[in-house]
C-alpha cells in the first residue's frame, strides 16, 4: 500500500454496533438510511485523500494516508464522539455507534491482506471492549487470536 505519495498511514475497519437490532426494530428501509447517513457522516469527518469504502452490511474500511499514530487516535476520538450522536430518521432517534479497529502502516505491514487481517483482529478487540470504542493492532493481539 505504500507509494511515493504515501509513506505511512493507517487502515481502519469499522463496524456498527447492534445494526441487526436496528433492522429488526425499525425495518430494513430505516437500516438502509442509517447506512447511507453513516457513510456521509464518515466522509465528512475524514480528509479528501482518505479512501472510504463500504465492505458490505454494516462494515466500512478507511485507508488514511500519511497520518501518524497520535493524529489517527485524535481523529478516532472525534469519530467515536460524533457517531454517538443519534440519527433523526422519520420520527425516530436512532443511535448507531461504531467499533473501530486499526493498524498502522508500515509498522505492522505494507500488503493489503496482511493489514486487513490485523485491522480485523483489532476490530474484534474493540467490539469486546463495548460500544463506540477503538483499538490499535499490536502483535500481542495476534498471539491471543490464534
Label every PLM stretch briefly.
Residues 52, 78, 82, 88, ...:
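Cyclic nucleotide signaling catalytic output domains
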Amino acid at each position: 500500500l505504500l507509494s511515493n505519495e504515501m509513506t505511512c498511514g493507517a487502515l481502519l475497519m469499522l463496524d456498527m454496533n447492534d445494526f441487526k437490532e436496528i433492522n429488526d426494530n425499525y425495518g430494513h428501509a430505516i437500516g438502509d438510511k442509517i447506512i447511507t447517513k453513516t457513510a456521509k457522516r464518515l466522509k465528512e469527518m475524514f480528509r479528501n485523500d482518505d479512501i472510504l469504502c463500504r465492505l458490505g452490511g454494516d462494515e466500512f474500511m478507511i485507508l488514511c494516508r500519511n497520518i501518524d499514530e497520535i493524529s489517527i487516535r485524535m481523529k478516532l476520538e472525534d469519530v467515536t464522539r460524533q457517531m454517538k450522536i443519534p440519527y433523526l430518521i422519520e420520527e425516530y432517534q436512532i443511535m448507531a455507534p461504531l467499533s473501530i479497529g486499526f493498524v498502522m502502516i508500515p509498522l505492522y505491514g505494507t500488503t493489503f491482506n496482511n493489514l486487513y487481517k490485523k485491522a480485523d483482529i483489532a476490530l474484534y478487540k474493540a467490539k469486546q471492549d463495548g460500544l463506540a470504542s477503538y483499538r490499535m493492532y499490536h502483535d500481542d493481539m495476534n498471539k491471543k487470536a490464534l
